[in-house]
Structure formats: structure tokens, C-alpha cells
């Protein structure tokens, strides 16, 4: 499990910010930022509904989102679990799933809000693979090495061996848009997608795809 505390500094990590509970620092705020108030977070960010629905099923989706929202309170100086212990996302406080990457390493013992001490990824190996594939596609030189880089990400996302070809997920062609879309799924909730949408001038396209049931208004 990539997002566990144990894998915070695995071979996947290229550059990351380190935290230590033993050193008494303030910790990683991403668990609170991506958790709803009812889960003892701040509801700062959560996935747009159509993005969640379009996200390919599989191991990566299961790791990226929380669909049963924890129902917690704060009593006696500690975070407690209420009854029921969780609520299905569509009837939850925010009517959305939560991002789940940072909740895998959350610490509920420090204070009234969930916090974490897992290293925060700035760049990781899968992003390097996708940057390479996109650069090759953008330069008109998409080749076997670029497709292999993309397919390694797609295989792992499906819970397969990333280094073994698999016709069920491998692609034989890919455009820049295909790769940027894959990057959006791979790095969901990691604060990268906005920059890719702006860079590729596809922000308006993403907005146009918003689910009509989306309850979060856009500020214009």
C-alpha cells in the first residue's frame, strides 16, 4: 500500500517533505485538509463528482477515495467514533467521496483534528513516467519506450505487475490528452491537476464536464 506510513520513503518517492512526531513538529495537514468535518477534518478539498465517476475502477481508485465517510467526534481530549461509525458518501455531510490517500496514515491521537506524519510526496516515480510519456507525445515522437512508461502506470493502477505487459490494460497509442487524463487519475488529490489543466489549456473542458448534481458552486 503506497500511502501507508511504512511506504513513506519507498523507491516510488523522488522528492518529499518529511515529518516526525518524535520531533514535536506540527505534522502533515493533508489528512485534515482531505477529510470532512464529520471525520474531524476541515473539508478543504474533495473530488468533483464527474471526476470520481469517470475514474477507472480498480486498486488505484480504492486507494484514492474514501466512500464510507468516518463519523467522529471529540470528547475527553481525544477523537472518538460515533454511531453509526460511517456514512455512505452520497448522503454524507458534503455529498461527495473524500480523497483517501492521506487518511491511510492519519493520526487520531494528537488533538481535535486528524493529522499525519507521513512524508508528503512532491514528486514520485509514476509522475516521472507520465511526464516522459507526455513529452514524447507532445514532440511527435511517441514510441515503444513512452508507451511502456504510460502502461506501467496503468498496469499498477489495475493492481497488476507494472513490469509485465497485459493486453487488458495496455494501450498501443496515446495522445497528450490521454496522458494528461491518466496523470489526473494517478495524482488525484496531490495538488497537481490544476497546473496541468492550465498548462494544457483544458480547464474549460474540465469545467464543462462537471456533474449537473454538483453542489459546489464555482466562484467567477
What residue spans do the PLM features occupy?
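Acidic/polar-rich alpha-helix caps and helix-coil junctions
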Residues: 1-27, 59, 69-220
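Short, cationic low-complexity segments
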Residues: 34-52, 85-87
